[in-house]
Curated annotation (Swiss-Prot):
This is Error-prone DNA polymerase. Its EC number is 2.7.7.7. DNA polymerase involved in damage-induced mutagenesis and translesion synthesis (TLS). It is not the major replicative DNA polymerase. HAMAP family: DNApol_error_prone. It comes from Rhodopseudomonas palustris (strain BisB5). It catalyses: DNA(n) + a 2'-deoxyribonucleoside 5'-triphosphate = DNA(n+1) + diphosphate. GO terms for molecular function: 3'-5' exonuclease activity; DNA-directed DNA polymerase activity; nucleic acid binding. GO terms for biological process: DNA repair; DNA replication. GO terms for cellular component: cytoplasm. Gene3D superfamilies: Metal-dependent hydrolases, Nucleic acid-binding proteins. Keywords: Cytoplasm, DNA damage, DNA repair, DNA replication, DNA-directed DNA polymerase, Nucleotidyltransferase, Transferase. Belongs to the DNA polymerase type-C family. DnaE2 subfamily.
Length: 1110
């Protein structure tokens, strides 16, 4: 007997967040394996996952390709049973998107508030399947069907789902009678929640997370069995053997739906152009106007040909409108004095340069336009433009105003489960205690690894063989990579000529005034929609604020173009010493170590510096050959083809500036084009294959072709193989040369400001936080080391932002602003500008109240300050705790005492204030002086830095007794192999993907910083200490390079954070009998452990957290 075909119309993916237990791609593969006629993906009030299923259908590994039905499960706020809605054609799909947008724009981010009444305006062409719950009232189902059949739709069905609870026969018969009475067909569906029965346990966990309960308390809210998976047609036919029409109806249903995502024909918005001009003509006019502006003396024939070629490709591909859009956005930003700069592959375009979008001069860098746009490649261009991060919102709101929210929205980003979040959610769901889940989660840092191993479980103090722990680890590993929710992209906009909400639903973002679509950048690439990237860059904010400070206090106004990269030798000398804290792109540990080795002397050296410390060049083994050649330790050799197979100098032309070593993506592509005779399109395919080969293994065909072509043209086979291996090492991490050049411009400008105006640079950096590698304490410490005086927060002198004050020696002094006080309410001027333009009320601003009150006369007492500012008592306590009343003659302790005696949040009238003041003076008791060490601790807790000292100063006697040397001693050591001990505050932890598991740690004490290297084996032994310590003790061996780069290679580590709780001015060195080996002393149970004795709330967090990168 022939098995009837079957289409499953009720599939829920994991984009029904915390409900579906399988990826869309999983369903496509399982439906293919089972030979299903079609699958219908219908997630809860969303189309977020459909493009992934659509894209997977193009996978060549699929033996059978089921039809994909695109739909959504409409969940109503008024209690109406769920409805599966499938558009029969393109117009109906647009209506479904708009319906979902209506619901999403009513609610907060992640919500969708729909009522059945909303369907009336959008139901035309939607095939609707009512999905009754397990327990139902026939009258309610009949009423819902009556309401649906009254709509103008593509048809109405009643979903028939077996629940495998022993009553399916009776239940389905009841539903069939309701359907017959309503004159609608019944349709079979397994109402699928996961693609395979093995996913049932994970789906149970997701249900617990969604319901905020545990597996032993969720009860009937869990599915009763593991049957809600995709089933083969034969199994569904067996289940519905009493109603074969329900199976046949699935095929009729699928046949009535013609819509596919192939029908989404994207139309980029038409930009306004002068009368009688096309977009292309207007773009060409702007381009040649830019040429005249940037090159008043004229351009070479080569550059003229380059621009002509680019304009020709833009015309052929129809991208003129896109270039006009980006040009307009950049024009607007500059009209508002917002710094911006294009980067990425767009910097390969001479047209982008003369339009003012990018800063890479085509006469300085050999551009490869095919890296950006190709005649042969049907891919939209992608222009990334960075704007000041504090003012980007002004640009974003301009885009909304210009195009309207129905035509412009931000692209989504899918937030996935990572190891730590997966462990926490699974642990809670399984009923593990918070202590256990925290212990497990704390062994994972960021996105390291794919899950937990047995060693990590043991390090958490848990038994890896405990069945519950083992199950938690197994399920958490399975959950990693699942979508958790949608967020907004960092700045990618989709713009359309028609309504954007007819392509994809639009919803509210968490941030006020922003809306975003449900698809991420990969989704819109698959649909061939174009994206405009409006990105945020903190360094642009810092540079603009620095320029403003220089103009205000030194009378010179600079622009980015005024800072010439070859003018100041002192800047390069500073960088050669590795003095780059705060400098854009070269302040990381690896970059600081590279600077003394590479010794940059010119701008192109900075281009190489930016690019060389990347996983691509490192994994391709390009760094050491380049440095050896640069230092004349190895000859520069350019292989040439044998005989007359080609130009003997072709590789020298390509690799000459990098001494024969390929460092940039463009060089890899040029080698493929010039030496291996790839077409430009094939070269770009090679680049894309290199970016993904570790995941999809598509690079093999390019390897054989490239190596074969090189050998055929007379190149040595060993060279050909090595060349390809080097290029393959780029992976997805190699920089385009144009991108590195864009960033190198900002490297130089920020280095120039640090070198020539360290006062303005420090102040601007502090006012641009959070950004960069280093916390305010290190920024301030570096400025002080460069002869800049930094003054504390004070109510008589500080503003909301940090400011410059009168000169003190060579430089102006930096006054810390109220923004440095943790928890203090102040308003950022840039954000307030956006609020004003949007018609919103100003934000609360305690700092502005202080500044306004100060204009009415000096604060000669705390009581007068409280009366004039009318600040809440909480603000006064924060100021006192930050030691901000020194100018009034009150230190931290005295100020706190005085504040606490003030009435609660009641402004004092004039005479009452005078009386209160007299009473305070009368009753004031002398307070013991607060030790400096306690002040330092309090400074770190309140303003995240201290100008009074470093915590390690006061712990030095204790550590000296343990033969611990200073960080300066480590950094000045030149004896490789020497064993030394060091201790300090952890500033930065890094575990780059290219470092093969090596962790780099930067420690700081009162003398400076020391750099640690922790090899993987040591990391596994001391994972808890490496990841969790704020004050770290380490023993290891010195590793010193000839260039003066020094590391301490760690062998043993100990978390000594508890020592911070015992800080005191008169801390004495321990007696001989109290000396201990840190590794053998479990401080958690030590009877003298100060951490166990001190319970003051201040001791909960003494130091701000380190900055960790991975």
């Amino acid at each position: 007997m022939k098995v009837p075909a079957y289409a499953e119309i009720g599939v829920t993916t994991n984009f029904s967040f915390l409900e579906g237990g399988s990826h869309p791609q999983d369903y496509v593969h399982e439906a293919s394996r089972l030979g299903l006629e079609a699958i219908g993906i219908a997630d809860r009030n969303t189309l977020a996952g459909v493009v992934r299923a659509y894209s997977e259908l193009g996978n060549e590994d699929l033996i059978h390709k089921p039809r994909l039905l695109i739909g959504a499960r409409l969940v109503f706020a008024d209690g109406t049973p769920d409805v599966l809605a499938y558009p029969v054609d393109r117009a109906a799909y647009g209506r479904l998107c708009r319906l979902l947008s209506v619901g999403k724009l009513r609610g907060a981010k992640g919500e969708c508030h729909l009522a059945v009444a909303d369907l009336e305006a959008f139901s035309q062409g939607l095939s609707l399947v009512l999905m009754p719950p397990y327990r139902f009232q026939a009258s309610a189902i009949a009423a819902a069907l009556q309401r649906l059949t009254a709509l103008e739709s593509g048809g109405v069905w009643l979903g028939l789902t077996p629940y495998y609870r022993g009553d399916d026969k009776r239940r389905l018969a009841r539903l069939k009678r309701v359907a017959w009475a309503a004159r609608v067909p019944g349709i079979a569906t397994n109402d699928v929640l996961y693609h395979h029965p093995e996913r049932r346990a994970l789906q149970d966990v997701l249900s617990c997370v969604r319901e905020k309960t545990t597996i032993d308390k969720i009860g009937r809210r869990l599915e009763a069995n593991a049957e809600r998976h995709l089933k083969p047609a034969a199994e569904m036919a067996r289940l519905f053997r009493a109603d074969p029409d329900a199976i046949a109806e699935t095929l009729r249903f699928a046949a009535g739906i013609s819509f596919t995502l192939d029908e989404l024909k994207y139309h980029y918005p038409d930009e306004p152009v002068p009368p009688g001009k096309t977009a292309q003509q207007h773009l060409e006019d702007l381009t040649w106007e830019g040429v005249a502006e940037y090159f008043p003396a004229g351009i070479s024939d080569k550059l003229h040909a380059t621009i002509d070629k680019e304009l020709g490709i833009i015309a052929h591909r129809g991208y003129a409108q896109y270039f006009l859009t980006v040009h307009d956005i950049v024009r607007y930003a500059r009209s508002q004095d917002i710094l911006c700069q294009g980067r990425g592959s767009a910097a390969n375009s001479a047209v982008c340069y003369v339009l003012g979008i990018t800063c890479v001069d085509p006469t300085e860098i050999d551009l490869l336009f095919e890296r950006f746009v190709s005649e042969e490649r049907d891919e939209p261009p992608d222009i990334d433009v960075d704007f000041e991060h504090s003012r980007r919102e002004e640009v974003m709101q301009y885009i909304y105003r210009r195009y309207g929210r129905h035509r412009a929205a931000i692209v989504a980003t899918v937030i996935h489960y990572r190891p730590r979040s997966a462990i926490r959610d699974v642990g809670k769901a399984l009923g593990l205690s918070e202590d256990v889940t925290a212990a497990l989660a704390d062994t994972v840092w960021g996105s390291w690894g794919k899950g937990l191993n047995e060693m990590q479980v043991k390090q958490a103090g848990l038994d890896p063989h405990n069945p519950l722990i083992g199950r938690a680890v197994e399920l958490a590993t399975e959950l990693i990579g699942f979508p958790r929710h949608l967020s907004q992209h960092v700045g990618g906009y989709v713009l359309t000529q028609d309504r954007l909400d007819s392509y994809v639903p639009i919803g509210n973002a968490a941030m006020e005034g922003r809306t975003f679509i449900e698809w991420d950048k990969d989704d819109i690439d698959a649909i061939k929609m174009m994206k405009v990237d409006v990105l945020a860059l903190g360094m642009l904010t810092c540079i603009r604020k620095g320029f403003d400070l220089i103009a205000q206090h030194k009378g010179v106004r600079y622009a980015l173009s005024d800072i010439k990269s070859e003018d100041d030798n002192a800047v390069y000398q500073m960088l050669q010493r590795g003095e780059s804290i705060g400098v854009f792109q070269v302040e990381s540990r690896a970059q600081m170590n590279m600077l003394p080795r590479l010794k940059p002397k010119c701008f192109y050296d900075l281009v190489i510096e930016v690019a060389i410390v990347r996983p691509g060049p490192i994994q391709g083994d390009m760094v050491h050959p380049y440095l050896r050649r640069r230092n004349k330790q190895e000859p520069v050799v350019y292989p040439a083809p044998a005989g007359h197979a080609g130009d003997a100098n072709e590789l020298e032309v390509i690799l000459g500036k990098t001494l024969g070593v390929p460092l940039f993506q463009e060089q890899a592509m040029r080698i493929a084009i010039e030496a291996a005779h790839f077409t430009p399109d094939e070269a770009n395919q090679l680049r894309r294959a290199m970016a993904t080969f570790r995941n999809v293994g598509t690079i093999g065909k390019f390897e054989s072709k490239m190596v074969g072509n090189l050998v055929a043209r007379g190149y040595d086979p060993v060279f050909a193989k090595n060349c390809f291996e080097q290029i393959k090492g780029f992976g997805s991490y190699g920089f385009p040369e144009s991108h590195a050049a864009s960033f190198a411009k900002l490297v130089y400008v920020s280095a120039w400001m640090k070198c020539e105006h360290p006062d303005a640079f420090c102040c601007a950096l502090l006012n641009s936080q959070p950004m960069g590698f280093y916390a305010p304490a290190q920024i301030v410490g570096d400025a002080r080391a460069n002869e800049v005086e930094v003054r504390p927060v004070d109510v008589s002198f500080s503003d909301g932002q940090c400011t410059l004050e009168e000169r003190c020696g060579k430089h102006h002094a930096v006054r810390l602003g109220f923004r440095q006080i943790d928890g203090f309410v102040w308003a950022d001027p840039d954000e307030e500008r956006v609020r004003r333009e949007a018609g919103l009320l100003p934000s609360e601003d305690w700092a502005a109240r202080i500044v306004a009150a100060r204009a009415r006369g000096p604060f000669n007492s705390l009581e007068r300050f409280a009366r004039l500012t009318a600040l809440p008592k909480r603000a006064l306590i924060l100021l006192a705790d930050a030691d901000a009343f020194r100018s009034l003659g009150l230190d931290r302790r005295a100020a706190l005492w005085a504040v606490r005696r003030l009435p609660d949040d009641v402004p004092l009238p004039l005479f009452e204030a005078a009386s209160a003041s007299e009473q305070l003076d009368e009753n004031a008791a002398p307070l013991p002086q607060m030790p400096t060490a306690e002040h330092v601790v309090a400074d770190y807790q309140t303003v995240r830095l201290s100008l009074k000292g470093h915590p390690m100063e006061f712990l030095r006697p204790l550590f000296a007794a343990e033969r611990v040397v200073t960080c300066r001693s480590i950094s000045e050591s030149r004896v490789s192999g020497q064993r030394m001990r060091c201790a300090g505050v952890v500033l930065v932890r890094q575990r780059p993907g290219s470092a093969k598991g090596v962790v780099f740690i930067t420690l700081e004490d009162e003398t400076g910083i020391a750099n640690l290297v922790v090899w993987p084996a040591v990391m596994e032994t001391f994972r808890k200490e490496v990841m969790g310590a704020r004050l770290l003790w380490v023993e290891g061996r010195i590793q010193a390079s000839p260039e003066g780069v020094v590391h301490l290679v760690a062998e043993r580590l100990s978390d000594r954070s508890f020592e911070m709780t015992r800080l005191s001015d008169n801390l004495a060195a321990p007696r001989l009998g109290e000396l201990h080996e840190p590794l053998n002393d479990d401080r958690r149970e030590h009877p003298d452990n100060p951490a166990q004795r001190i319970r003051h709330p201040r001791d909960v967090r003494i130091l701000p957290p380190s900055r960790d990168f991975h």
